[in-house]
Amino acid sequence: MAKAVVFFAEGTEECEALLVVDLLRRAKVEVLVASASGSREILSSHKVHITADALAEEVDYSDVDLVVLPGGIPGTPNLAANKTVTDTCVSFVKTGKKVAAICAAPSVLAALGLLEGKNATAHAAFQDKLAGAHVLDTEVVVDGNITTSYGLGGAIPFALELVRQLAGETEADRIRSAIAYRH
């Protein structure tokens, strides 16, 4: 069974984060919600209380296939400030494991030098922060083992792409139909 970790921090955009958790779990992917805020209790960008499964520092990433960075302010800078999050992203990219980021969060990957020479996207307000990347203004961009999306409006196609990567095209199509997503 594939395994994913979705990082949450104080101020994470809850819809982007929880949609990924939901659709991956529908696809029978094992998903761990990991807090990057030093507490399992997280307050999202729109004041939704979320309880993480574990702290990011407690997770064994050796059998994890994908890590996901949701956007949100101040969630994105809070993710960027967490050494476990940034070290894990660098390690995953260097070893060919999958990393995904949406909205403002691709800027974290760019700051780490992980988007150098890659195609990527981000929220329009953060596209200028994608140093070294070839920025595309589209919902979802996959370049090698890195997947990016431009924001909440692209969250469903982003999550479905992650389902496709971890559980296959048939499962992504099944979920697309089950949630009545017709785009």
What does each model-identified segment do?
Residues 40-44, 139-142:
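Short acidic-hydrophobic surface loop/beta-edge motif
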Residues 12-17, 41:
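Short N-terminal binding/cap micro-motifs at the start of the first secondary-structure element
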Residues 18, 35-38:
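Short glycine/proline-centered loop/turn elements that form peptide/ligand docking sites
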Residues 41-53:
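A cross-family phosphate/adenosyl-ligand binding-site feature
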Residues 3-12, 26-35, 53-183:
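Active-site-adjacent pocket-lining segments in enzyme domains
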Residues 23:
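Rossmann-fold NAD(P)-dependent oxidoreductase module
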